[in-house]
């Protein structure tokens, strides 16, 4: 009897591990974790840092010892992504590998590990919804649904006009202001690139933010709750209302 139960359980486990990862666990990235050649993303396509960004490359490398160039892989990938309109083709990764003098696989490992690196095309305004527990409890799924429904896309897709795409990111570190989104603005490449947090958002507020971006406006980032100042409570402080008392010390002369 026990042997039959064990065999049945083993079969169930094997069936689970045969499924694609996306069916087993919630994916933390909207892209594949491997590369597929396409007409606009293959190793033999030329890619180089622009003349304007060459000086930025030198500046980034200057922060590290010459024998530790590989430490610059993340900021260089970020710069390449900004230049390329928000995504990293494999030829851009190869260019970074050449700059820091490592095998390309070392750069691929970093680019596929961090979900902030996009290996497929995104919109000029890439909207990322925080999906971690505090934001989820505060309604991040409703925020994401509002964005997807308003834009008429699925997660990871780009709107027909090329302006917007929506993805998910894990904890953005502003849990006290949940729920929140971030907007990566690639509309001007690496010149004028911004990455801003919009906190205390509602489904209506994120739609309003999208429409302001569509008009070329720059909506104010930070908390979207007018009753809050940064991460303070609504209506102002509830504690620490006066000057704090000084620390108490013993009279050492009395010892």
Curated annotation (Swiss-Prot):
Q: Which UniProt keywords apply?
A: 2Fe-2S, Electron transport, Iron, Iron-sulfur, Membrane, Metal-binding, Mitochondrion, Mitochondrion inner membrane, NAD, Oxidoreductase, Respiratory chain, Transit peptide, Translocase, Transport, Ubiquinone
Quote the transit peptide annotation as a residue range: 1-35
Task: State the EC number(s).
Answer: 7.1.1.2
According to the UniProt record, one GO cellular component term is:
mitochondrial inner membrane
* EC category: translocase
Q: What is its main location?
A: mitochondrion
Q: Which cofactor does it need?
A: [2Fe-2S] cluster
Q: Does the keyword Translocase apply?
A: yes
Region Disordered, residue ranges: 214-255
Xref: InterPro entries: NuoE-like, NuoE_dom, NuoE_N, Thioredoxin-like_sf
Is Membrane among the key words of this record?
Answer: yes
Tell me the cofactor note.
Answer: Binds 1 [2Fe-2S] cluster.
GO MF terms listed in the record are:
2 iron, 2 sulfur cluster binding; NADH dehydrogenase (ubiquinone) activity; zinc ion binding
Catalytic function, reaction form: a ubiquinone + NADH + 5 H(+)(in) = a ubiquinol + NAD(+) + 4 H(+)(out)
Q: Where in the cell is it found?
A: Mitochondrion inner membrane
Stated role: Core subunit of the mitochondrial membrane respiratory chain NADH dehydrogenase (Complex I) that is believed to belong to the minimal assembly required for catalysis. Complex I functions in the transfer of electrons from NADH to the respiratory chain. The immediate electron acceptor for the enzyme is believed to be ubiquinone.
Q: How does it assemble?
A: Complex I is composed of at least 49 different subunits. This is a component of the flavoprotein-sulfur (FP) fragment of the enzyme.
Q: What is this protein called?
A: NADH dehydrogenase [ubiquinone] flavoprotein 2, mitochondrial
Question: From what organism does this protein derive?
Answer: Arabidopsis thaliana (Mouse-ear cress)
Q: What is the lineage of its organism?
A: Eukaryota, Viridiplantae, Streptophyta, Embryophyta, Tracheophyta
């Amino acid at each position: 009897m026990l042997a039959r139960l064990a065999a049945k359980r083993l079969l169930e486990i094997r069936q689970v591990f045969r499924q694609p990862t996306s069916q087993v666990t919630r994916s933390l990235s909207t892209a594949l974790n491997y590369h597929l050649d396409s007409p606009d993303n293959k190793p033999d396509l030329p890619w180089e840092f622009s003349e304007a960004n060459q000086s930025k490359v030198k500046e980034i490398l200057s922060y590290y010892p010459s024998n530790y160039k590989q430490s610059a892989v993340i900021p260089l990938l970020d710069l390449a992504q900004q230049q390329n309109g928000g995504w990293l083709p494999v030829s851009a990764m190869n260019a970074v590998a050449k700059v820091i003098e490592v095998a390309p696989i070392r750069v691929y490992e970093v680019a596929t590990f961090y979900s902030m690196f996009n290996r497929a095309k995104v919109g000029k305004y890439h909207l990322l919804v925080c999906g971690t527990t505090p934001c989820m409890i505060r309604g991040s799924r409703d925020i994401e649904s509002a964005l997807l429904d308003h834009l008429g896309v699925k997660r990871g897709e780009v709107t027909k006009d090329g302006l917007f795409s929506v993805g998910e990111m894990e904890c953005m570190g502003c849990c006290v202001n949940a729920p929140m989104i971030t907007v990566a603005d690639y509309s001007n490449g690496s010149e004028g690139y911004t990455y801003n947090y919009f906190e205390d958002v509602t489904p209506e507020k994120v739609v309003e933010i999208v429409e302001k971006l569509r008009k070329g406006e720059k909506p104010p980032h930070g908390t979207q709750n007018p009753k809050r100042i940064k991460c303070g409570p609504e209506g102002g402080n509830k504690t620490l209302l006066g000057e704090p008392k000084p620390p108490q010390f013993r009279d050492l002369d009395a010892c």
